[in-house]
Amino acid sequence: MKIPAFIELLKPITWFPPMWAFACGAISSGQSWSLHWNVVLIGIILTGPLVCASSQAVNDWFDRHVDAINEPQRPIPSGRIPGRWGLYLGIIWSLLSLLVSSYLGVWGFYATLIALLFSWAYSMPPIRLKQNGWFGNFACSISYEGLAWITGAALLSSTLSPSHPSLM
């Protein structure tokens, strides 16, 4: 397995929306980033290159049979990521996400756990939320945007309600 195939599996282009949502939530808290720069940095890394990336690996693993027909050039069906390594990378990246989230306290850990549960339930049989337009879209909207935004706001303000009015 080569590094370019691994990076392609994690789909960096998809990381921006949850990272942006976390940053917007942090801004909406009304708190100074200079006092909480480490929380913001860890949160942005957690939402994009870790949680979102793990969801991409998990989804590609469980879609490998369909991708073998529709998109055979992808890393798993093309064999650039051999055997069960696609699954192993999804598991490793999910566990790494939980480890990093533990540095954000209880709120950060449980928000990450919920996002990861949604990402696995979205793709993994027999649940496969993606097979239902309502449940699949709900899982994506919560784990990609909603949860990231709320977590960014909550981690900086230490509450679910901002201390200052915002234009949300």
Model segments located where?
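Multi-pass alpha-helical membrane architecture of UbiA-family
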Residues: 1-168
